[in-house]
Each structure stands twice: as C-alpha cells, then as structure tokens.
Curated annotation (Swiss-Prot):
The keyword Glycoprotein applies. InterPro entries: HBV_HBSAG. Residues 2-173 are annotated as: Pre-S. Residues 2-252, 202-252, 369-374 are intravirion. Coiled coil: none annotated. This is Large envelope protein. Residues 2-118 are annotated as: Pre-S1. Disulfide bonds: none annotated. Keywords: Acetylation, Caveolin-mediated endocytosis of virus by host, Fusion of virus membrane with host endosomal membrane, Fusion of virus membrane with host membrane, Glycoprotein, Host-virus interaction, Lipoprotein, Membrane, Myristate, Transmembrane, Transmembrane helix, Viral attachment to host cell, Viral envelope protein, Viral penetration into host cytoplasm, Virion, Virus endocytosis by host, Virus entry into host cell.
Length: 399
C-alpha cells in the first residue's frame, strides 16, 4: 500500500508516483534513474538501501530523524541532502559541591550548643526539684521517705534493678521461647497423624456394616429419586444430596460411640489393673477367709500383687469372707453401682438382663448360625477389627 503524491512536471502533466518519499525500501527519488517519469527505473538504481539498513534513521537536510531512510525530499544525492557533521556529545560537567572519595564524619557539636535546655538541670537544680512531692513520686517508690532530706543518688546497677523490680523483667530470650513452642508443635503433629489413622477405622467398620446388606455382591448405593438424582456410588461415601447420606451419618455416629465406649472401658480396666479404683485388694499369701470385721471396699490398692483382686464382703454373724475375683469383675460391679446411684432407671433393666442371661443357649445357636452363613467371608468381616486385636490380647493376658 504505497503513498501517492502528485508531482507537477514542466510540461503540465501529473504523474502519480507510488511511495515518492521513500519510506519503503528500494524506492528513491533519484533523477538519474527517471524517478519523475512514466517509467522509473527502480531496479537499476545502485544506491538502493537494503531492508536491514531501512530501519536506520537517515540524516538529511532537516537534521537527524526528519528524513526518510531511503532519501530525502530533494533526492538521494549528498548535494541535495546537505552535509551534516556529527559531533560527539560533551560529557556533563562535574559537580562542584562534591569531592571524590569518602569524606570524614564531621565533629559532633557540643551538647550545650545542640541541646541548651539540658544544661539547665545541674546537680543543685535537680535536688531542688526533688523537694516537690509530685517529682519525688516519679523517682521513689510509694512508701519511701517523704522528708525533705534527699537520699544519696543510687548507683547505676541499683537503679536499673529497682526499675526492673517495678516494671517487670527484661525481654526473655527468643531461643528459649522457640524451644518452648517446639515440643507442643511436635505433639500436635503426632496427634494429627494418629487422628488420620484412627479415622480410617470408622470407614472400615462402615464398609463392613454396609456389606452385610449386599451378600454376594459389591455394595452400591443407587441414590436415585425424583428430587436429587445422582450416579451410583458406594454407600460409605454418599454425597449430601443422596438420600442415603443421613443413614451414613447415623452409622458413623454409632461407630464413633462404640469406639469411644471401647476406649473408656480399656481406660477403666487399666486403672483397675493399676489399683487406682476404690476396691479392696487381697494381700498375696494371705488366706481367702478372714474372721475379723468386714473391710470396706473403698481403700486404694497398694500394688502389692501383680494381678490385683477384689474383696467381696459377705457378712455372716459379724464376720466376712473375702473371695478373690478378677479385677474386670470388680470393675463391672463398681461401674454398675456407680451408674445405678446416679440413674435410678437402670434398676428397671435388671429383669431384662436376667431374662437375656437365661437365653444364652439361643444366643450361642444364633452365633453358630451366623458363623456358618458368613463363614467364607469371615476374614473380610473381621478385617476392620484387626487393629483392635492387640488391645484385646493385652487385656486377656494381663487381666
């Protein structure tokens, strides 16, 4: 897209010359090659600029930057462009208000010149100002001498110690603060790691629970209804819009309660084994029958026996018989008495427990039938409880 410019010739005709100013390469207004004729000879011009040179700023009759890179308004020849001499730029003059090199720091003026108000407080003026009770309250603690006699000025060490005794200790060492925070951070990290491992137990128990409803197949939650259609997924990972989400939350809640109860039982059994429950242990090597007055079962065990036993008081003619029983039995008895004393409605459950104990053969038959029915997949059913087996083993051995 060339720029057109109409050039008036001497015989009165106008010739439209494409790109006459030479803004594009290989276009110059050189009269020697018929630039202003009908047939300009662009290809035989030996003074054509190449494209790499076309990007340079030309120097012409109007100074640098005012002429096209392929010739000026008056043609290509140097006579038409004029001669321009390029002079090197003079360096900037050196600063007159600065000397080379680092200068010495000027001497600090004396205090009497910079802070004349500080020189007004000499020793005599200061002691006179201390006679004012308002000024004395700033320098002496409450309860000090209120007489006109001024105490001698304390030394620097005693003054600093008195100031710290009133306003507090100096700033503590940051290294001790960092070491104090390191321990709790490590405990928090270990607790978070254990929590992530413990949270996998409810998920495994939930998978086992839901697998009981899908015998012989993979558990799949359809999750299809008119309000919230969702895709098929596992019943242990229902989204909130799934109808089975509330049942999943209920199962997880029951599982958490079960784990909490199991941990509580383990803790109480451990306390009973350590002799910290209010039971009456028997001294090793003593007789199981005592003829003295009945002892109360409220004293703490002294740890004299490896496996603490409990004292069961059975009054008979003013005497009691001490029967050693397992500590877990003592724990159950203690827990039942503690709960019955605080919840009176638990006494209504005694007939039901006695009736259930009479159905023990039926219960055993039910357990045998369940083992026969789920025998092939017994390992899959018990696999969520594998992390709990070491705890049960320790309880079985040491209690």
């Amino acid at each position: 897209m060339g720029l057109s410019w109409t050039v008036p010739l001497e015989w009165g005709k106008n010739i439209s010359t494409t790109n006459p100013l030479g803004f594009f390469p290989d276009h110059q207004l050189d009269p020697a090659f018929r630039a202003n004729t009908r047939n300009p000879d662009w290809d035989h011009n030996p003074n054509k600029d190449h494209w790499t040179e076309a990007n340079k700023v030309g120097v012409g009759a109007f100074g640098p930057g005012f002429t096209p890179p392929h010739g000026g308004l008056l043609g290509w020849s140097p006579q038409a462009q004029g001669m321009l001499k390029t002079l090197p730029a003079d360096p900037p003059p050196a600063s007159t208000n600065r000397q080379s090199g680092r200068q010495p720091t000027p001497i600090t003026p004396p205090l009497r010149d910079t802070h004349p108000q500080a020189m007004q407080w000499n020793s005599t003026t200061f002691h006179q100002a201390l006679q004012d009770p308002r000024v004395r309250g700033l320098y002496f603690p409450a309860g000090g001498s209120s007489s006109g006699t001024v105490n001698p000025v304390p030394t620097t060490a005693s003054l600093i110690s008195s100031i710290f005794s009133r306003i507090g200790d100096p700033a503590p060492n940051m290294e001790s603060i960092t070491s104090g925070f390191l321990g709790p951070l490590l405990v928090l990290q270990a607790g978070f790691f254990l929590l992530t491992k413990i949270l996998t137990i409810p998920q495994s128990l939930d998978s086992w629970w839901t697998s009981l409803n899908f015998l012989g197949g993979a558990p799949v939650c359809l999750g299809q209804n008119s309000q919230s259609p969702t895709s098929n997924h596992s019943p242990t990972s229902c989204p909130p819009i799934c109808p089975g989400y509330r049942w999943m939350c209920l199962r997880r809640f029951i599982i958490f309660l079960f784990i909490l109860l199991l941990c509580l039982i383990f803790l109480l059994v451990l306390l009973d084994y350590q002799g910290m429950l209010p039971v009456c242990p028997l001294i090793p090597g003593s007789s199981t029958t005592s003829t003295g007055p009945c002892r109360t079962c409220m004293t703490l065990a002294q740890g004299t026996s490896m496996f603490p036993s409990c004292c069961c008081s059975k009054p008979s003619d003013g005497n009691c018989t001490c029967i050693p029983i397992p500590s877990s039995w003592a724990f159950g008895k203690f827990l039942w008495e503690w709960a019955s004393a605080r919840f009176s409605w638990l006494s209504l459950l005694v007939p039901f427990v006695q009736w259930f104990a009479g159905l023990s053969p039926t219960v055993w038959l039910s357990v045998i039938w369940m083992m026969w029915y789920w025998g092939p997949s017994l390992y899959d059913i018990l696999s969520p409880f594998i992390p709990l087996l070491p705890i049960f083993f320790c309880l079985w051995v040491y209690i």
